[in-house]
A protein has these predicted regions:
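Bacterial N-terminal signal peptides that target proteins for export
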Residues: 1-9
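Small beta-barrel nucleic-acid-binding modules, primarily SNase/OB-fold domains
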Residues: 19-226
Length: 226
């Protein structure tokens, strides 16, 4: 007899296979931030035509709002030049408030429905967000509430991806020099000749979280074929 799979296993399998659904860019107009739902600076619930979606920003990473992912917290402490994990969390709360205010009205979502994993039981997908002509990712980095370090995408098109990412790295360098946002109390400095922060290879912490959920589900699975 085949025993019933636990909900955690179903979620884990979905997270692993979710990228198969990713395709062409789609535009969702007249979106709104879902009220009274979990969010942080770069991940939030969005309402569109009566449906609730969770989106995670491409290209950037905001400080965490809790310490549940120690590897990411440690990496953010170094990148933002913060001495304590509590400073990261405090900066994460400010990034959250920035995004909440930025998305107070209607906005546009561009997505390929690429799986962003995470630890929610609801599917989460990567996206680019616009309010008018303003790109949320760019504004977060400009204000020092995010770093130019995140899942890349072929946006705005394959030929211009590098210039877009280079622009984000220049915005981060400006935020460090101006000591704004998470860089207000930073110990990080830049040489006078540095016009952009160094490019870093992306580390997919989202996959690690999804893998942990799947493994937890598999560890609790018992199957009897007799």
């Amino acid at each position: 007899m085949l025993r019933k799979l636990s909900p955690a296993v179903f979620v884990g399998v979905f997270l692993v296979l979710g990228n198969a659904a990713a395709g062409e860019w789609q535009t969702l107009e007249k979106c709104r931030l879902a009220p009274d739902q979990y969010m942080d600076g770069d991940s939030f619930h969005v309402l569109h035509e009566g449906k609730n979606h969770i989106f995670r920003l491409y290209f950037v990473d905001c400080p965490e709002t809790d310490t549940s992912v120690p590897k990411r917290i440690a990496d953010q402490m170094e990148d933002f030049g913060l001495a304590k994990d509590t400073a990261v969390v405090a900066a994460g709360q400010k990034a959250k408030e920035f995004t909440k205010k930025f998305l107070a009205g209607q906005f546009m979502v561009l997505t390929k429905w690429e799986d962003a994993r995470g630890n929610s039981q609801q599917p989460r997908n990567y996206a680019v967000i616009f309010v008018g002509k303003k790109n949320l990712a760019e504004e977060l980095v400009r204000s020092g509430h995010a770093r130019a370090f995140g899942m890349p995408a072929d946006y705005p098109d394959a030929s211009r991806v590098k210039s877009f990412k280079d622009g984000l790295r220049r915005l981060q360098a400006n935020a460090i020099r101006q000591k704004v946002g998470a860089f207000t109390g930073t110990s990080r400095g830049l040489a006078p000749t540095e016009t952009a922060v160094p490019e870093r290879e992306y580390v997919d912490y989202e996959s690690e979280i999804g893998g942990q959920i799947l493994q937890e589900g598999l560890n609790g699975l018992s199957i009897d074929f007799n």
